[in-house]
Amino acid sequence: VDVEVLKSNELEQYKPLNLYGWSKHKFELHARDEGLLSRIVGLKYFNVYGPNEEHKGDMRSVVSKAFAQIQENDGMTLFRSHVPEYQDGEQQRDFLYVKDAVRMTLHLAENIDAGGLYNLGCGKARTWLDLAHAIFATLDKDPDITFVDMPESIRDKYQYHTEADISKIRQTGYSDNLFDLEDA
């Protein structure tokens, strides 16, 4: 268990950009400060997607929303990049197929020695363009992507890159192959 690393100031360095991230961060700090990390398993799921999400409405995954948008409109709208490090559509996310999320969760639930905080993702950042092209190919449609300005209200909070470090769950013996966007 990687508890000793978390006892250091490592957790102090993070600056969450939204309330959800802040609540996760505060829980992690509390668990660390109370000496609970070796007795709990905390899971941080990265962009989970999969079938049958329609009932979640606006809370469904971005993958589900993009699929519906392309299916209904034959095109997809993406935010322009507002930083020089990323071109339009090159913003990145770690997309995790729901079947992988379930397998990872069950693995940790069944592993009596697991303890601490785990990132659950595929461990590989993919671009919004990768996502768009995978969906267009699945629907057998020619790509039609429109870029629009990102609303001012979210520009300073927008994450241009997320990628789960899944080395910790791999160290517990989890060795399953993970779905790629193109295969899920």
Regions found by a protein language model. Give the residues of each.
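Generic alpha-helical secondary structure signal
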Residues: 61, 65, 161-164
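Catalytic helix-loop patch of NAD(P)-dependent Rossmann-fold dehydrogenases
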Residues: 1-49, 53-54, 58
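C-terminal substrate-binding subdomain of Rossmann-fold SDR/epimerase-dehydratase oxidoreductases
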Residues: 70-184
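Hydrophobic alpha-helix immediately C-terminal to the catalytic Tyr-X-X-X-Lys motif of short-chain
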Residues: 26-30, 34, 62-66, 131, ...
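A generic local structural motif
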Residues: 7, 28-29, 63-64, 105, ...
